[in-house]
Every structure is written in C-alpha cells, then in structure tokens.
C-alpha cells in the first residue's frame, strides 16, 4: 500500500500549479474565513461524495491548520484508494505565511 508524503508549502504550490487537487480539512468556519484558491473543503459530510467522484490517481494535497490533522486525513485517503497523497507540513498557517497572496475568503 502506498503511503502519503509530508511536504512543505513550496512543494504543495508546485503540485497545485501542476493540477493537483487540494483538500482542506479544517472546520467550515475557518475554511470560509480564508483558504487556498480552488481548494475543496472536506469533512465527514462531504467525504463519501468526494471519494466517489474523485480521480484516485490524481495527486491529492491535504491541508489542515498546522499539519497534524492532515496526516490522519491523508492516511485515510490512501486507505480509500488514492495513490498520490501529500500532507502539507505547517498546514494552512504556514501556507498563509509563505503565500499570503494565494489565499481567498468566502
């Protein structure tokens, strides 16, 4: 079984530019307040539909607050059949510091 990889925001941005799917596992209020453009909010209510509709071979980058919860989510997604999964070290907080222009509200 493939395992997920931990990556810094810079590598996540490179994957994003190459068409990877970004999923944000923070709570809905945090996502609404600020998130990475084109990222998908993923929670217990949306995960089944997301998995059913996803391309399991497309790179998938998981982001949370600080890079901890995203590791559990990434491991779960690997277990669901995704073959190319990444967890962003430092999470959205480090992303926002590294790429302040690459965040949106709403």
UniProtKB/Swiss-Prot annotation:
**A GO CC annotation given for this chain:** cytoplasm
Stated role: Transferase that catalyzes the transfer of sulfur from thiosulfate to thiophilic acceptors such as cyanide or dithiols. May function in a CysM-independent thiosulfate assimilation pathway by catalyzing the conversion of thiosulfate to sulfite, which can then be used for L-cysteine biosynthesis.
Gene symbol of the encoding locus: glpE
* Annotated catalysed reactions: thiosulfate + hydrogen cyanide = thiocyanate + sulfite + 2 H(+); thiosulfate + [thioredoxin]-dithiol = [thioredoxin]-disulfide + hydrogen sulfide + sulfite + 2 H(+)
What is the designated name of this protein? Answer: Thiosulfate sulfurtransferase GlpE
Q: Taking every annotated instance into account, which residue ranges of this chain make up the domain Rhodanese?
A: 16-104
Q: Pfam families this protein is in?
A: Rhodanese (PF00581)
Gene Ontology molecular function, alphabetical = thiosulfate-cyanide sulfurtransferase activity
Q: What class of enzyme is it?
A: transferase
Q: What residues sit in the active site? A: 64 (cysteine persulfide intermediate)
Q: What is its EC number?
A: 2.8.1.1
